[in-house]
């Protein structure tokens, strides 16, 4: 075949194939166009997904940093959504009214009833305790969390004993919670628990005041506004506290007191409606507060003094009092027992107090105990938590429209505090080492009405007996202020009281 023939043949083949090639190009173009449309749609979907994801992330971030406000149990609380930061506002007022049913007062020279040593105003008040009313507590504060692991609490109090005060710090502390062993470190001003009765909040206590033995031990190295650093731990059936404490804020001294407060509790038996609590506690004063400068050759006095009021503080007079004891230290040891069965509970504590006195005089020791029981008539049990029994919550808060009356609770207590050491017999002068602080016995019958979770009323009857001998000399002041040695300066009387409390 010549080249001409080949050229003609190839041209003919192209001519016959051209329509097929054109059709193939059209199909390819259609597929490309379809792919481009799909790609465009996919790009649009991706853009929408990006925007939606960005919006969701923004919403999550906004929710994480958003704050919530609640009024659970009447307490205003502000919190971040993750709970890392919270602020709860607290408030409480306790208005106490009391009538002291005493024998009529006589002249100072013939009526020997007395109060604290060396206090002329208490000499007068002991013979005529003041009926009336006072705000035992009027507190406002804030507590909460910060950065998840930190807790804080600040509480200011305008109440007082006998008369209201201008205001003082009741609590001001910060606490860190370790991620293991439920261990917490607290530093600031607070009252480390020194016993079973001390550990319960006054907002939920069975009576308007703690039993005198418990309150006396509390005042040694604990109490509201006490500077301290403490380790606190606990599990399902135990708690433990160890604290180093100093002075109470606002207490003036030279060298401050240094002391240790420790407590350990255990629940050996527990069921849904019953439990048994046991515990031990101690308060040890290593260095009592100095009463003056420590001059070479004439060291400062470091006094320890134990005294208390008759478990009500409308009148602030103390009827038992050891006076100042110049001491190197003090050790108090306490044993606790509590039990609960449904809406009935009992608790008791015993305390032994040993004072390490300076000089050649023998070391005095004192003791006290109490037993109390509570029965909720309406059936609600007291709430046991962290080594203490807190107030019941009314199942049916007071509401006249619904015919509900809140929770009602009966309380019974007997307490004994003995601040005598080698007191001797009536009509005799004391020996050199004697301390005639007095022995106080109180029987209390109470009725509590829990209107709702924030309001309650407490009515009580107390039978008080104080047995105390005069040490003579000028213990209560010069002249007629101090009865003859061995004279009875105690008394028996009754108290009728009512507390109105609003707490959130």
Please identify what each model-predicted range represents.
Residues 1-23:
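Gram-negative bacterial Sec-dependent N-terminal signal peptides
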Residues 57-77:
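Coiled-coil termination/hinge junctions
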Residues 68, 77, 230, 336, ...:
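Short, surface-exposed charged micro-motifs
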């Amino acid at each position: 075949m010549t080249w001409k023939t080949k050229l003609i043949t190839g041209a003919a083949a192209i001519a016959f194939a051209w329509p097929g090639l054109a059709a193939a190009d059209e199909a390819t173009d259609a597929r490309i166009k379809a792919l481009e449309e799909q790609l465009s749609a996919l790009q649009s979907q991706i853009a929408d997904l990006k925007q939606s994801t960005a919006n969701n992330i923004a919403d999550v971030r906004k929710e994480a940093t958003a704050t919530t406000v609640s009024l659970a149990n009447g307490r205003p609380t502000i919190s971040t959504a993750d709970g890392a930061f919270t602020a709860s506002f607290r408030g409480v007022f306790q208005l106490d009214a009391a009538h002291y049913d005493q024998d009529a007062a006589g002249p100072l020279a013939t009526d020997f009833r007395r109060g604290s040593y060396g206090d002329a105003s208490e000499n007068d008040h002991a013979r005529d305790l003041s009926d009336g009313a006072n705000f035992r507590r009027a507190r406002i504060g804030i507590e909460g969390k910060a950065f998840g692991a930190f807790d804080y609490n600040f509480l200011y109090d305008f109440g007082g004993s006998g008369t209201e005060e201008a205001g003082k710090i009741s609590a001001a502390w910060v606490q860190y919670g370790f991620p293991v062993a439920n261990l917490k470190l607290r530093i600031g001003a607070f009252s480390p628990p020194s016993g079973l009765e001390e550990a319960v909040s006054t907002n939920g206590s069975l009576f308007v005041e703690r039993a005198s033995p418990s309150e006396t031990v509390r005042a040694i190295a604990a109490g509201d506004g006490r500077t301290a650093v403490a380790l606190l731990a606990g599990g399902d059936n135990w708690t433990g506290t160890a604290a180093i404490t100093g002075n109470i804020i606002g207490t003036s001294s030279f060298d401050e007191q240094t002391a240790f407060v420790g407590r350990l509790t255990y629940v050996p038996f527990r069921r849904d409606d019953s439990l048994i609590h046991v515990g031990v506690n101690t308060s040890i004063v290593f260095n009592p507060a100095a009463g003056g400068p420590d001059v070479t050759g004439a060291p400062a006095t470091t006094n320890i003094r134990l005294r208390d009021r008759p478990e009500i503080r409308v009148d602030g007079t103390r009827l038992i009092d050891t006076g100042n004891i110049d001491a190197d230290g003090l050790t108090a040891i306490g044993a606790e027992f509590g039990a609960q069965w449904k809406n009935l509970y009992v608790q008791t504590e015993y305390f032994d107090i040993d004072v390490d006195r300076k000089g050649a005089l023998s070391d005095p020791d004192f003791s006290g105990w109490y037993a109390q029981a509570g029965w909720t008539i309406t059936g609600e049990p007291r709430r046991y938590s962290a080594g203490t029994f807190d107030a019941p919550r009314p199942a049916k808060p007071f509401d006249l429209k619904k015919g509900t009356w809140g929770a009602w609770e009966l309380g019974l207590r007997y307490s004994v505090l003995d601040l005598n050491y080698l007191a001797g017999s009536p009509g005799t002068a004391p020996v050199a080492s004697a301390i005639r602080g007095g022995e106080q016995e109180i029987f209390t019958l109470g009725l509590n009405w829990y209107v709702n979770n924030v309001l309650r009323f407490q009515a009580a009857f107390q039978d008080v007996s104080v047995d105390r001998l005069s040490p003579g000399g000028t213990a209560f002041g010069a002249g007629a202020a101090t009865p003859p040695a061995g004279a009875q300066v105690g008394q028996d009387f009754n108290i009728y009281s009512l507390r109105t409390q609003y707490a959130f």
